[in-house]
Amino acid sequence: MAVTTPDWLKQREGELQVHKDGRSGSVYFAGQLQYVLMPMPAKGKFACRISETINGRRLDGDGIYPTNEDALRGGLEELRAKLGW
């Protein structure tokens, strides 16, 4: 199953664009790139690195996920929580 833009992001006029490699994604608000999510190997599974593009600040959570897709979905949820939504 492909990773799609979650409802909470759509409600705020945001968009997820999964990169052509299918392994990472970018979050846009009002057409402007705001965050990059990149699943990374962690403890034999995957974690998600979340970077704010305007200043490079990292917003990573501590979730570990079984697959790359799950890490991308989990990273979106971690981002939602960090943003207080």
Each predicted region: which residue ranges?
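A short, exposed loop/beta-hairpin motif centered on an aromatic-Gly-Thr core
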Residues: 55-70
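A short, structured beta-strand/loop element
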Residues: 33-59
